[in-house]
């Protein structure tokens, strides 16, 4: 664990919005008197009807979370209209295509027109306030237009990552009963086409079998590639927007009206629809974007995430645009045409603030420094990381090589459920320790508790909980409030349980140690082990499967699968490849197994429970101390698993 400290550099402190003194003062007020603090900072967005109530939350009983509840606003208005008078000609979105020679710039005035037209197309086809619209798009500006158009008319968007399979897309369409889908003919990633429209068609057939019928599909033409077409259902975006006006008044939304649903992996296998509402979410996304990235007007800001993840929602679209920023949207991948792409884009567009994932940093670090140093990167002044803890070696490389030892590295810990940053340094206020997410953001009260729920004081290792609500917090699991209570509030009564383990050091800095539940963090993306297990078991030769994570040099966590086959079948390399393909088809490439070990049996207790602790140890090639195995029904199973492990690092 690194204990090296990087103090706040003088030049950073000199221009920062928040210094140490202000951080301490504001933080104290935010936790001692949240009504007063958020009552003041809620005014950073425009309200049609000002709120008089600030915080109305309870983490016990039925669990109810309401912020600014009697206020009325509109997210699209705050991200576009309010900037037009003074900054209409400023660039809102820089789009950098997969092909390095293709890019475009969209001003706030142009963004207004695009969003109003798309909103009018939705209205023309019967989409109303409260209806759910599924967005299955690549990283093109139309994805942002679609989100903002939904927000403008009060429709609830559900963005599904373009790398997910038709089956995963169908499950998300069915869960929120969405009848309108926005997609495009094909996406492009690393020079290769992605069949989004064909995937959508397949997903719609699967959804129809579950009695959810999609009535309209709006299709953006990206490549001009051939796709299936259903006349009467499918609509070309370019034809539709030509038939409507470029004016659409924003609907007055209550602060607690839903803004979006975003599905995230749970430990039970069925993805959870995380529901975020309008007012509190936008206040929090906007405020964290400004202070965590020390955003100054005129900065060029680039977050490399996909809009299919919460990072894309909060820190490509809503946070930056609400702050009248110029936000860069990147369609491509870090290693196409080669591993220098990120750094070339930074030079090309004079990027000042750069936010990416540790998994990308580790893979680019492995490619060598030359790809970085052949670019100037002189425009950079701040680097950020998101998605998983960053190991100190990758942190130092990012700081020394990418940032030339002059850009603070802002390691942000947060979740789909939190809406925005929770534990993070503020660049002008907090000395940095490589590998630590450092200290809580305003209004965030972290607590470490032991397995019995006892709150630990001082330097300690424990389960990370949050003791009180903050405005960006999710409000419920869509359609299943009981699951919301059970998942987040039943383990430690009266506290929000994050599912993460954490260490607090003697300086009060927080170090995230990883998931403590059955959720994997693969390349910064959450995947439930149960999802991967059920995908494996759906193959006709598999009788049983257990999935665990193990340390992976690039992805952070790899996916290790133990598979028991139907009687009479042998495990072969061909079958291994077939199972990898099968999982990719069921969930998407993100869930590709890294290791598959064929096993005659799994270690179970006499009551039939799989002992995952043992499977984790074997996957980590660390089986010297397996702990208590006395409850195993068949101890010989373990010897076989050890002998045939796929991760032999030792003789």
Swiss-Prot record:
The modification N6-acetyllysine is found at residue 609. This is Acetyl-coenzyme A synthetase. ATP binds at residues 387-389, 411-416, 500, 515, 526. Acetylated. Deacetylation by the SIR2-homolog deacetylase activates the enzyme. Gene3D superfamilies: 3.30.300.30, N-terminal domain of ligase-like. Catalyzes the conversion of acetate into acetyl-CoA (AcCoA), an essential intermediate at the junction of anabolic and catabolic pathways. AcsA undergoes a two-step reaction. In the first half reaction, AcsA combines acetate with ATP to form acetyl-adenylate (AcAMP) intermediate. In the second half reaction, it can then transfer the acetyl group from AcAMP to the sulfhydryl group of CoA, forming the product AcCoA. GO terms for cellular component: cytosol. PANTHER family: ACETYL-COENZYME A SYNTHETASE (PTHR24095), ACETYL-COENZYME A SYNTHETASE 1 (PTHR24095:SF14). NCBIfam families: Ac_CoA_lig_AcsA (TIGR02188), PRK00174.1 (NF001208).
